[in-house]
UniProtKB/Swiss-Prot annotation:
Classification via Pfam families: PEPCK_ATP
Coiled-coil parts of chain: none
Primary localisation category: cytoplasm
Metabolic or biological pathway, per its Swiss-Prot or TrEMBL entry: Carbohydrate biosynthesis; gluconeogenesis
Enzyme class: lyase
Gene (name only): pckA
Key words, A-Z: ATP-binding, Cytoplasm, Decarboxylase, Gluconeogenesis, Lyase, Manganese, Metal-binding, Nucleotide-binding
Protein's UniProt name: Phosphoenolpyruvate carboxykinase (ATP)
């Protein structure tokens, strides 16, 4: 286990890491066998502390700005050495893992952590290969030292913590951060940069496969139903969050899941519930006196999480990959009540809505009032993780859709009949019926009606769905009011889209403001 006096534990097992974490006071064992750890004041990602080293090999391909902030190479090297020195006389944990379940497109990574629980997280979320780095590729190094405190004046960081990606030297530095999700998302960002150069589209989506081998992808921001709808008892899960679409197939970038735990129940989410057992890391979950997790307690954060390997899910695709997708679903939660429950998209419309990444959220005050409603646009349904200009990903999406003939659908899991507070939300059985119709191929050649203002084509009939729900104008009592809200939404789409430098065919595929 140990090599040398520094006590570096190489490729430790799950049981060993749980033992180390408990012995070192890093966490507690729960009644269901999971390890619970707390991350202190940072209970989510710290986007202001994330940087990319600006260097010749990658700088012309990165979309620099508030998401991808530059960091000087010499400052990075100095900080890397400082953190390495800090870890040199400490007990550390190292694993040889991989990112990307594809023999051609994987990246080998060596993950070094100061704590046992972060190492367990890495082994749960990344891929533990049977044989490491078969193709003998250059290895990425991830160094994670949550106990190290950065000094902005000395180190050039934004605060006492940082995440820095260095493409030239294949290094990722995480210092001063306990929130483990930063590790997962930093390697997602790395693959999001590397894969497009090989003609592979990286995606922030979930994916599942039917018994006939047909793949469906679900894109969507938090709270739109990505995890719920992909956990389908009739289908096999590939993954819940990060995938690559290459000519010939879809592969998971990860080897595990990082599920939200807020209000988790056995009845509503049995797949996640059953996956939480020995080996799982629970992050910022509160326990009662009997060590039973209280998933409804949001004292620490609403962003409590469970990190577990895919092996904890019975109904999964063991190879961690599948065929190219027959169906691609963009999930949006429209709080204005304007969008139809399902629309069929052309490849240009697909690129438009992929770039827009529209969903909406309600402000915390005066829930029923329209002033509390905010629309949110997150490029490619995951703006914080895409280093290249957005158009690169949109063009790749169109290419993949066209070459395979995938059908793309926009599915609204939000409101109808009026905005939030007036209309009502589509219930889960309605959305599930729509997804079933998409997956079965029922909607591929269905008759549609065009909604001019939204520039969308809507099926006239879907099995198991009330026909009058399909065209949103029919669910509003006041048609003029619907038109007003539709105009407002179309204007928001248009205003958001001005930032994209893409072909006219894509620009004209959106709502007509």
């Amino acid at each position: 286990m140990a090599d040398g006096s520094k006590q570096t534990h190489k490729n430790p097992s799950t049981a060993q890491l749980v033992e180390f974490a408990l012995a070192r006071g890093e966490g507690e064992l729960t009644a269901n066998g999971a390890l619970v750890a707390k991350t202190g004041e940072r209970t989510g990602r710290s986007p202001n502390d994330r940087f990319i080293v600006k260097e010749a090999s990658s700088e012309n391909d990165i979309d620099w700005g508030s998401v991808n902030k530059p960091f000087a190479m010499d400052a990075f090297n100095a900080l890397w050495d400082r953190v390495a020195t800090y870890l040199a006389d400490k007990e550390t944990f190292v694993s040889e893992l991989e990112v990307g379940a594809d023999p051609e497109h994987y990246q080998p990574i060596e993950v070094k952590t100061e704590t046992a629980w972060h190492q367990l997280f890495a082994r749960n979320l990344f891929i533990v290969p049977e044989q490491f780095n078969v193709a003998n590729k250059p290895v990425w190094q991830i160094m994670n030292a949550p106990g190290f405190e950065c000094d902005p004046a000395r180190d050039g960081t934004n605060s006492d913590a940082t995440v820095i990606i260095n493409f030239a030297d294949r290094k990722v530095l995480l210092a001063g951060l306990k929130y483990a999700g930063e590790m997962k998302k930093s390697m997602f960002s790395v693959q999001n940069f590397l894969l497009p150069a090989k003609g592979v589209l990286p995606m922030h989506c979930s994916a599942n496969v039917g018994s006939e081998g047909d793949t469906t992808l679900f894109f969507g921001l938090s709270g739109t139903g990505k995890t719920t709808l992909s956990a389908d008892p009739k289908r096999f899960l590939i993954g819940d969050d990060e995938h690559g679409w290459a000519p010939g197939g879809v592969f998971n970038i990860e080897g595990g899941c990082y599920a939200k735990c807020i209000d988790l129940s056995q009845k509503n989410e049995p797949v996640i519930w059953d996956a939480i057992r020995f080996g799982t890391v629970l992050e910022n979950v509160t326990l009662d006196e009997q060590r039973i997790p209280d998933y409804s307690n949001t004292e620490l954060t609403e962003n409590s999480r469970a990190a577990y390997p895919l092996e904890h899910i019975a109904q999964r695709k063991e190879e961690n990959r599948g065929a190219e997708p027959n169906a691609v679903v963009f999930l949006t939660c429209d709080v204005s009540g304007v969008l139809p429950p399902v629309s069929k998209l052309s490849k240009e419309q697909a690129a438009y809505h992929f770039l827009s990444g529209y969903t909406a959220k309600v402000g915390s005050t005066e829930m029923g009032s329209t002033s509390a409603i905010q629309s949110t646009f997150s490029t490619c349904f995951g703006a914080p993780f895409f280093p290249r200009p957005a158009g690169v990903y949109a063009e790749l999406l169109m290419k993949r859709i066209e070459s395979f003939g995938s059908q793309v659908y926009l599915v609204n899991t939000g409101w109808t009949g009026g905005p939030h507070g007036v209309g009502k939300r589509f219930d889960i059985p309605t959305t599930r019926a729509i997804v079933d119709a998409i997956v079965s191929g029922e909607l591929k050649d269905v008759e549609t009606v065009h909604i001019d203002k939204l520039n969308l084509d809507v099926p006239v009939a879907v099995t198991g769905v009330d026909a009058k729900l399909l065209n949103p104008v029919n669910t509003w009592a006041d048609k003029a009011e619907y038109d007003k809200y539709a105009q407002q939404l179309a204007e928001e789409f248009a205003a958001n889209f001005t930032k994209y430098d893409v072909s006219d065919a894509i620009k004209q595929a959106g709502p007509k403001a």
